[in-house]
Swiss-Prot record:
GO biological process: proteolysis
Protein name, UniProt field: UPF0758 protein Noc_0236
Annotated keywords: Hydrolase, Metal-binding, Metalloprotease, Protease, Zinc
Coiled-coil zones: none
Binding site for Zn(2+): 173, 175, 186
Residue ranges of every copy of the MPN domain listed in the record: 102-224
Recorded GO MF terms: metal ion binding; metallopeptidase activity
Amino acid sequence: MAITDWPVHERPREKLLQRGPNALSDAELLAIFLRTGVAGKTAVDLARELLESFGSLRALLEADLKQFCHAPGLGIAKYTQLQACLEMGRRHLEDTLKRGDVLTDPQTTQRYLVARLRAYPFEVFSCLFLDNRHRVLAFEELFRGTIDGASVHPREVLKRALAHNAAAVILAHNHPSGVAEPSRADECITQRLKEALALVDIRVLDHIIVGDGETLSFAERGLL
């Protein structure tokens, strides 16, 4: 049966308009993105099959081009459309950060860092540069490494902070292992960066570790 033959309150698009996106299942949200199904299958049927094939909505959203296009009903056009949607979401979070004090909205800050860093299969060290009112000036990915770690150079972090005329920074990196607990090396580099930046009166407000579904704040843990 075609979706247009379903009761109005069960159709994904109408359901979203009436009850909001939170009321929809992963399959229903994906069906709206797909718009159409394939021969003999509605968009919802196809969405359910794709979620089962990839294992989760997150796995589908983070699939590379080859994996994505190999799935039935998907292709380059859908891949580019999806990447555009994901990037708009990241930019919306970034714009939200830039309009306020990151210390008064730490959840948005952490959601943004998760969106930027979680999917990497290797370690990425990044930095949020802030003005004297703790508003975001810029976000930069500074160092990339392997699954086990990334080499961080305080001189380069200092150079970029001065280039942005930053008054404070929030450090961040991901743990591809998914575990957000800090290593001894994480604690050491945080202290080195804190000391180096203090020489030019730039404060390290926090160091966020992004894991799989969790984050850790050095400030909240008392490690700064």
